[in-house]
């Protein structure tokens, strides 16, 4: 099975070390462009663009990267709690059309009550997933070309429609990650690819089996992906030394503050990440070559595969054997590590190299009539 390898655009900051200004660098458009173009040339399938108040806006970043790349796909967040599904569907179709079919979408429900409150969202965990399920139903139906009437608990639309369809059919793929039962049910019923953070293989296997069974109950099959950091070097010793350097500037106070911030979230996935290290520096290798040091101060994905190219490739293939076909990777700093992964790791894997998409012809059309419909040739109607 050929593997889809993704990289990451660090719109929330980048550098050589975690938890310090030492070794940090400006993350401007030029730097992000360098990373995107490196990923484009090295054969990555796409890049994940993060979301949240600590990040630049993912959709605007994607739009600015489309003209400077050729084959790279962009995985950006859909935020059900803060965006109308009809507006999001129009935006998604536009990005897909402007990128010639290179748009991918990642459903993000949110997990930090403080950040959500700042965005005007005061729904609890179960309510957010109710709203996300309704949002996704409307979003998908619009992209499928339906005129939608929907009267849900959280979302109400009447006569919603999309005049300009996406390039990808039936619609751009929808990704999603969540570890709670309600999250897995949403994935099983509505998404195309289920993402998990980098837990040990036995825990990932358990999650995949749960989601696969839930999807089968809905008569569906979905794909699986995993989100990991990577520290790959020419030798295993060099890789482990690089891992230690990454957290060499962390002090106990910074770790404690970060863990306190993570503890206030209601994300089951974040709780599972924290349980891998319990905020302690010792015993960070939680599974062969799987290191939890990143999660001491970084929310979300908090584990890294560490080793030389053949060793890391062997661990990736262990996950692939569980049914995972997509790997969303990152490393610090992201420009240099994009090259290291491409040069030291890719030769040991069966990497799916994306082709440059051919321009898709769009049907000619006149201006929309009354902002409501596309005119047809009356003589042919």
Curated annotation (Swiss-Prot):
Transport recorded as keyword: no
MF (Gene Ontology): alkanesulfonate monooxygenase activity
Gene3D superfamilies for this protein: Luciferase-like domain
Top-tier EC class: oxidoreductase
Record bears the keyword Flavoprotein: yes
Reaction catalyzed: an alkanesulfonate + FMNH2 + O2 = an aldehyde + FMN + sulfite + H2O + 2 H(+)
InterPro entries linked to this entry: Alkanesulphonate_mOase_FMN-dep, Luciferase-like_dom, Luciferase-like_sf, SsuD_RutA_monooxygenase
GO biological process, one term: alkanesulfonate catabolic process
Domain of life: Bacteria
EC numbers for this chain: 1.14.14.5
Keywords: Flavoprotein, FMN, Monooxygenase, Oxidoreductase
Quaternary organization: Homotetramer.
Extra remark: FMNH(2) which is absolutely required for this enzymatic reaction, is provided by SsuE.
Protein purpose: Catalyzes the desulfonation of aliphatic sulfonates.
Family designation: Belongs to the SsuD family.
The protein's name: Alkanesulfonate monooxygenase
